[in-house]
Amino acid sequence: FIVQWVLLAVLAIVVVALARQIGVLQLRLAPLGALEVDDEGPPLGEAPEARSASTRDGSTVVVGGPGPGRLLAFVSGSCPICEQVLPSLPAAAGASRLELQVVSDPELETAYRIPGVPFVVVFDRLGVVRSKGTVNSLEQVEGLVDSARRRAAEAEEVRAG
C-alpha cells in the first residue's frame, strides 16, 4: 500500500515536470515577427514609382504612388503557405484601413527585389514603404502593419516638428 502512494507521488512529480517542459517549449516556439531584411524588398522610407502589376485573377492594378495606405501582398498560385495566409489578409488590411492589393507578378517581384512569397509591403498614403517582410501567419502581417503605422507616425512628427 505504501509503495503505491510512493509511485503515485513520483508520477505526480513527473507530470508536473512534463507540464513545465511543455510550457517552456511553447514559449520557444511562439510565432516570430515577420522577417524584415534591409536588402530584400523595396527600401524602407522610399517611395517607389507607380507600376502596373498583375493580380492573381489576371486583372491589372497600379502599385505604389500616392493614394490610400496599402498592404501589398506578393503571392504565387503554387505556394501552400500563400494559400494559408491569403484568407487573413483582408482582415489585417481592413482593421488598419489599408487598401489590399494581392499580386502575382514576376516582373514586379524582380523590380521590388522580392526574395520569395508570401511577401508583404505596407505603403503609407504618400506611397512610402513603411514596412516589409516575408510572412507566414496573420500575427506576422499584423506586426508589419503595426510597424508601418508607428513609422508613419514618426515620419509625420519629423515633418511637423
Give the location of each predicted region.
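Long, leucine- and charge-enriched amphipathic alpha-helices
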Residues: 1-40
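Non-catalytic, surface beta->alpha helical segment in thiol-disulfide oxidoreductase systems
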Residues: 121-159
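Catalytic cores of nucleotide-enabled group-transfer and carboxylate-activating enzymes in metabolic
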Residues: 57, 89-92, 120
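N-terminal "domain-start" segment that seeds a small globular fold
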Residues: 27-64
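Thiol-based oxidoreductase modules, predominantly thioredoxin-like and allied folds used
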Residues: 91, 95-108
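Structural alpha/beta surface segment adjacent to cysteine/selenocysteine redox centers
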Residues: 99, 109-119, 125-126, 131
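Short active-site neighborhood of thiol/selenol oxidoreductases, capturing the structured segment around
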Residues: 60-89, 141
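Non-catalytic interaction/Regulatory regions outside core domains
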Residues: 67-69, 84, 153-161
